[in-house]
Regions:
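Mid/C-terminal beta-alpha module of Rossmann-like enzyme folds, strongest
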Residues: 172-195
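N-terminal Rossmann/SDR dinucleotide-binding element
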Residues: 1-39, 60, 108
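A conserved structural motif in NAD(P)-dependent oxidoreductases
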Residues: 162-169, 179
Length: 195
């Protein structure tokens, strides 16, 4: 487990914790080999490149958690993994904002694909819900409807939405790490799963 040591008060039992930071403080990763790396915190291509360049010869399989926000157009149902991706007007931008998030993640994916050619898995989850979701974007709506009265909601009643329970994503990621699932995969509920 590689992190800055700031967000988890107690160490995870049985798991070695390596302290560092993606922005150049990677010394604790040097001189070690791994079967699989699961990268769930890559938001800026430069940071991902620092990691992949260091680990390229020391890791057999690099698994990168991306997002469906990389797609240029999500207005139609059935977006497949080969759909066009977002392109940033300025690919050197490093500020993660609503308008740069998807494009930055697409650039991060490109770094992983280049440095781990044939040895990578990119998982593109949709909206994640479940334990640990502090956004309240999923639980708010049933709660609000239970309050009764008029309410303003985005979209139209027939707009589809696809979400994914974080526990299902975790199972898929672990299965992908344990078996030779290579390539790019969307991770979401079935297209008719929620309306």
């Amino acid at each position: 487990l590689f992190n800055r040591g700031k967000s988890q008060a107690q160490p995870t039992p049985g798991v070695e914790t390596l302290l560092g930071d993606r922005d150049g403080q990677l010394d604790s990763l040097k001189g070690r080999d791994w079967d699989v790396v699961i990268d769930n915190s890559g938001y800026v291509p430069r940071h991902v490149r620092l990691t992949t360049e260091l680990l390229r010869e020391r890791v057999r399989h690099y698994l990168f958690i991306s997002t469906v926000a990389v797609y240029a157009d999500l207005s139609a149902a059935g977006v497949t993994e080969d759909a066009p991706l977002k392109v940033l007007a300025d690919p050197t931008v490093e500020e993660v904002r609503r308008d740069t998030y998807g494009g930055l993640k697409a650039l991060c994916e490109s770094v992983v694909r280049t440095d781990f050619d044939g040895r990578y898995t990119v998982v593109r989850p949709t909206y994640l819900v479940g334990p640990g979701d502090d956004t309240d974007r999923f639980t708010y709506w049933p709660w609000r409807m239970s309050q009764g009265g008029d309410m303003l909601a985005p979209g139209t009643p027939d707009d589809p939405i696809q979400y994914l329970d974080v526990r299902d994503l975790a199972r898929f990621v672990i299965a992908s790490a344990a078996t030779p699932h290579r390539g790019v995969f969307n991770a979401c509920s079935p297209p008719d799963g929620a309306r």
